[in-house]
């Protein structure tokens, strides 16, 4: 097995996703994905939801995993005119631009690498060890797949899942994930904000409390 190393999982805006949408969602992907890349964003997922009548949810992020409200506004203003002109959704709908969230979908190999050690729910195309749905900790991520350490098994149980066999995958909210995700987000934001500005922000926060 060839394990993914630090060089291979460097943030890459061109890294392909493991899954593809179909139907109307696929048409939306074809329209918006080329618009996101020049702005420094990459698509995570497109989904039509029966919320508020009909909601078109577009998840996106920067290659480093960050995503702000301002980023969502930029994407919305960029893609809305094209979606209106192309009229791929004939019914009235609500457009929702969002970050992947803490319990994010895992859609690229690098997602699985970055979140090794955390709990995920996985669905497979074919039956593996008698089932298609799994929950467990991600371990030993390679270029071809990973080991899942199954939760709540009477005895220690692991299963190998190949990337080509996955139909759906996302992180599960746990105390550890929430704590570490917030810490990672704070560290990324500190890298993007000049030190003097960050110190001022911290002072203002402490003062307001």
From Swiss-Prot:
Keywords: Cytoplasm, Ribosome biogenesis
Cell compartment(s), UniProt: Cytoplasm
GO cellular component: cytosol
Single Gene Ontology BP annotation: ribosomal small subunit assembly
Main location per the UniProt record: cytoplasm
Its biological purpose: Required for maturation of 30S ribosomal subunits.
HAMAP family: RimP (MF_01077)
Similarity comment: family membership: Belongs to the RimP family.
Signal peptide: none
Name the record gives this protein: Ribosome maturation factor RimP
Gene: rimP
InterPro entries: Ribosome_maturation_RimP, RimP_C, RimP_C_sf, RimP_N, RimP_N_sf
UniProt organism field: Bartonella bacilliformis (strain ATCC 35685 / KC583 / Herrer 020/F12,63)
Highest taxon listed in the record's lineage: Bacteria
Pfam families (alphabetical): DUF150_C (PF17384), RimP_N (PF02576)
């Amino acid at each position: 097995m060839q394990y993914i190393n630090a060089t291979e999982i460097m943030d890459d805006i061109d890294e392909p996703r493991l899954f593809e949408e179909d139907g109307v969602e696929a048409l939306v992907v074809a329209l918006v994905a080329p618009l996101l890349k020049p702005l420094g964003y990459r698509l995570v997922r497109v989904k039509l939801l029966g919320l508020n009548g009909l909601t078109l949810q577009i998840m996106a992020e920067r290659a480093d995993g960050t995503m702000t409200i301002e980023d969502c506004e930029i994407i919305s203003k960029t893609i809305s005119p094209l979606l209106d002109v192309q009229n791929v959704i004939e019914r009235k709908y609500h457009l929702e631009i969002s970050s992947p969230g803490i319990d994010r979908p895992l859609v690229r190999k690098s997602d699985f690498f970055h979140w090794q050690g955390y709990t995920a729910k996985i669905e497979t195309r074919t039956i593996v060890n008698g089932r298609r749905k799994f929950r467990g900790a991600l371990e030993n991520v390679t270029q071809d797949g990973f080991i899942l350490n199954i939760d709540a098994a009477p005895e220690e149980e692991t299963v190998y899942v190949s990337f080509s066999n996955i139909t759906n995958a996302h992180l599960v909210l746990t105390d550890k994930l929430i704590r570490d995700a917030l810490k990672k987000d704070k560290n990324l934001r500190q890298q993007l904000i000049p030190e003097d500005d960050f110190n001022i922000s911290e002072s203002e926060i402490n003062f307001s409390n």
